Swiss-Prot record:
Pfam families from the UniProt entry: Elf-1_N (PF12310), Ets (PF00178)
Effect of mutating G252A: Loss of transcriptional activity shown in IFNB1 promoter-driven luciferase assay
Subcellular locations according to the entry: Nucleus, PML body
Effect of mutating T187N: No effect on transcriptional activity shown in IFNB1 promoter-driven luciferase assay
GO cellular component, one term: nucleus
Name the UniProt record assigns to this protein: ETS-related transcription factor Elf-4
Tissue: Abundantly expressed in the placenta and in a variety of myeloid leukemia cell lines. Moderate levels of expression in heart, lung, spleen, thymus, peripheral blood lymphocytes, ovary and colon. Lower levels of expression in Jurkat T-cells and other T-cell lines and no expression in brain.
Clinical condition linked: A chromosomal aberration involving ELF4 has been found in a case of acute myeloid leukemia (AML). Translocation t(X;21)(q25-26;q22) with ERG.
Gene source species: Homo sapiens
Annotated phenotype, changing P512L: No effect on transcriptional activity shown in IFNB1 promoter-driven luciferase assay
Effect of W251S: In AIFBL2; elevated IL17A expression in patient colon biopsies; patient CD8+ T cells have reduced PRF1 expression when activated with IL-2 compared to CD8+ T cells from a healthy donor; severely decreased transcriptional activity shown in IFNB1 promoter-driven luciferase assay
Compositional bias ranges of the Low complexity kind: 308-341, 503-518
Role according to the record: Transcriptional activator that binds to DNA sequences containing the consensus 5'-WGGA-3'. Transactivates promoters of the hematopoietic growth factor genes CSF2, IL3, IL8, and of the bovine lysozyme gene. Acts synergistically with RUNX1 to transactivate the IL3 promoter. Transactivates the PRF1 promoter in natural killer (NK) cells and CD8+ T cells. Plays a role in the development and function of NK and NK T-cells and in innate immunity. Controls the proliferation and homing of CD8+ T-cells via the Kruppel-like factors KLF4 and KLF2. Controls cell senescence in a p53-dependent manner.
Gene giving rise to this polypeptide: ELF4
């Protein structure tokens, strides 16, 4: 086969050595035939290959492969590569000859043909030629993919390539000059003085920090601003070095100069006088002024109050007895101020936040918010003779208890309200001491919510509640308290022999406010104080009803008694008589107190005591006798039923818990 080149009649002759046996044999370069070149009129063959146009063939064989080129680059005429279509082996041999031709210059070689990305810049890729897949060895798949791309652009000259390579080298050098950004470092020289404050200089020659920038950083650091350096007139940029020695030491650590002092730093400050950055305030020592203030300046001086406010919650969370009592007084004052602005409500809503865990009574609560109704620890002294009194609490095993202290605590949904009964001996400092003829008082206090209780027993009130609540306005101002009345739970022969009921009294600055006979206090719970002094609701008392009212009064602080003292008081003075006990199921009651005046209790009561040892199981049912024979004007609070009651409804709020507390 001969290839004729017009018009110069350049002829290529070669011998065919079984090229049509197997196509895959072309992968071996040793199989290729020898090429005989008769005439090479133009030795610079780079123009020949750079001027070839691409013809994308799907089957990988060059059919109708006319490779065009410009006339001025090769010969006077057109360079035409013809094919007689006799056999595909001739076409493959022709392409292989063109690829493997030796050139006098070192520019044309196999690598430059295959790797077109080296011949052309990355910004403008233009592959030189498209060749069949079987013409490339298997060890060069990347070169095959690069050579297989199609393009209609013409080739570029060597001058254009050289210029683009030079531009690419320049861009590469410029990229190398860019330094990697380092990680953010601490801007506080006090927390870590060894690490400098990273500031980008204006000229772009690295990162450094100047003295005036260092002083600005100190003024924006809450660790140094009030202590070592501070603003005197921030709007004018005037600041003072409170501790010049400490500031100079910090600057020395920043510059890695341990012997830095204020004199050396002062010389650097005087340098800024000439630059117009700083100025010395005349007549004042260690006072300087910034000529221009930055816009994004962090203000530290105004954050002193907020820092004190943020430090208050940790103090409140770990408050002692005194701080807890102060919090209670503050919440009481806030409640009393906001009380006359709303309307009264006879229902008590469940708290939104639960305080879980048993704590001493004096530090039961955290500070409540004004918009949430949270039962808090408050004890109210009710006395018919005095309005506002101060309490001096004294507990003695030999004294007769004239007050019964009840505590109620909501433990959230799914659990029962727990009452805590504690006898107190209260001495009035502004009035006569409590005598044995005084009526029994009920001093009530809320106990924080607890998840579990060790010992629990119940008491059933057996007062003959024949009267109903009177519609009367409570005149005593103060934090509103919910008054809950328990109905008569025992009927018929189970009524006490001395049915004289106690008197419920609310003490306040305007004088005591009493409720009519027949009212039994079940719980005093202080609300958020958003309601005014309410009017007590009236309604008939039924055997299965739970009536709630509200009274107001100034809350006092209660006192919890240890369990041993309480047991002695109950046994010696109140003539406590042990009765059969039962274990109370814990967390089995779910009271519903949201706006309901009636509460349906279980049909069978649970009665028990709290000894020091574990409760003994028993199937009997009875009541607890807590009679006080020395009290003449009031009946016994709780009486014993000699026989089991035919109908004794159980109220979840009558759960009573006795817990040992240390005074």
């Amino acid at each position: 086969m001969a290839i004729t080149l017009q018009p110069s009649d350049l002829i290529f002759e070669f011998a065919s050595n079984g090229m049509d046996d197997d196509i895959h044999q072309l992968e071996d370069p040793s199989v290729f035939p020898a090429v005989i070149v008769e005439q090479v009129p133009y030795p610079d063959l780079l123009h020949l290959y750079s001027g070839l146009e691409l013809d994308d063939v799907h089957n990988g064989i060059i059919t109708d492969g006319t490779l065009c080129m410009t006339q001025d680059q090769i010969l006077e005429g057109s360079f035409l590569l013809t094919d007689d279509n006799e056999a595909t082996s001739h076409t493959m041999s022709t392409a292989e000859v063109l690829l493997n031709m030796e050139s006098p210059s070192d520019i044309l070689d196999e690598k430059q043909i295959f790797s077109t990305s080296e011949m052309l810049p990355d910004s403008d890729p233009a592959p030189a030629v498209t060749l069949p897949n079987y013409l490339f060895p298997a060890s060069e798949p990347d070169a095959l993919n690069r050579a297989g791309d199609t393009s209609d652009q013409e080739g570029h000259s060597l001058e254009e390539k050289a210029s683009r390579e030079e531009s690419a080298k320049k861009t590469g050098k410029s990229k190398k000059r860019i330094r990697k950004t380092k990680g953010n470092r601490s801007t506080s020289p006090v927390t870590d003085p060894s690490i400098p404050i990273r500031k980008k200089s204006k000229d772009g020659k690295g990162s450094t920090i100047y003295l005036w920038e260092f002083l600005l950083a100190l003024l924006q650091d809450r660790n140094t601003c009030p202590k070592y350096i501070k603003w005197t007139q921030r709007e004018k940029g005037i600041f003072k070095l409170v501790d010049s020695k400490a500031v100079s030491k910090l600057w020395g650590k920043q510059k890695n100069k341990p012997d830095m002092n204020y004199e050396t730093m002062g010389r650097a400050l005087r340098y800024y006088y000439q630059r117009g950055i700083l100025a010395k305030v005349e007549g004042q020592r260690l006072v300087y002024q910034f000529k221009e203030m930055p816009k994004d300046l962090v203000v530290i001086e105004d954050e002193d109050e907020s820092s004190e406010a943020t430090a208050a919650p940790p103090q409140a969370s770990t408050a002692s007895v005194a701080s807890a009592s102060t919090t209670r007084r503050t919440s009481s004052r806030v409640s009393s101020r906001s009380a006359p602005q709303g309307k009264g409500s006879s229902s008590w809503e469940k708290p939104k936040i639960q305080h879980v865990g048993l704590q001493p009574s004096a530090s039961l609560e955290l500070g409540p918010s004004l918009d949430e109704e949270i039962p808090t620890t408050s004890t109210m002294l009710v006395s018919p003779a005095e309005g506002q009194v101060k309490l001096t609490k004294a507990v003695s095993a030999s004294s007769v208890p004239s007050n019964i202290h009840l505590g109620v605590a909501p433990v959230g949904s799914g659990s029962a309200l727990t009452l805590q009964t504690i006898p107190l001996t209260t001495v009035l400092t502004n009035g006569p001491p409590a005598s044995t003829t005084a009526p029994t008082q009920l001093v009530l206090q809320s106990v924080p919510a607890a998840s579990t209780f060790k010992d629990t027993f119940t008491l059933q009130a057996s007062f003959p509640l024949n009267a109903s609540f009177q519609d009367s306005q409570v005149a005593a101002p103060g934090a509103p308290l919910i008054l809950s009345g328990l109905p008569q739970l025992l009927a018929g022969a189970n009524r006490p022999t001395n049915p004289a009921p106690p008197t419920v009294t609310g003490a306040g600055p305007a004088g005591p406010s009493s409720q009519p006979p027949g009212t039994v206090i079940a719980a005093f719970i202080r609300t958020s104080g958003t309601t005014a002094a309410p009017r007590v609701k009236e309604g008939p008392l039924r055997s299965s009803s739970y009536v709630q009212g509200m009274v107001t009064g100034a809350p006092m602080e209660g006192l919890l008694v240890p369990e041993e003292t309480l047991r002695e008081l109950l046994r010696d003075q109140a003539h406590l008589q042990p009765l059969p006990t039962q274990v109370v199921s814990r967390g089995s009651h779910n009271p519903s107190l949201l706006g309901n005046q009636t509460l349906s209790p279980p049909s069978r009561p649970t009665v028990g005591l709290t000894p020091v040892a574990e409760l003994e199981l028993s199937s009997g049912s009875g009541s607890l006798l807590m009679a006080e024979p020395s009290v003449t004007t009031s009946g016994s609070l709780l009486t014993r039923s000699p026989t089991p009651a035919p109908f004794s409804p159980f109220n979840p709020t009558s759960l009573i818990k006795m817990e040992p507390h240390d005074i």
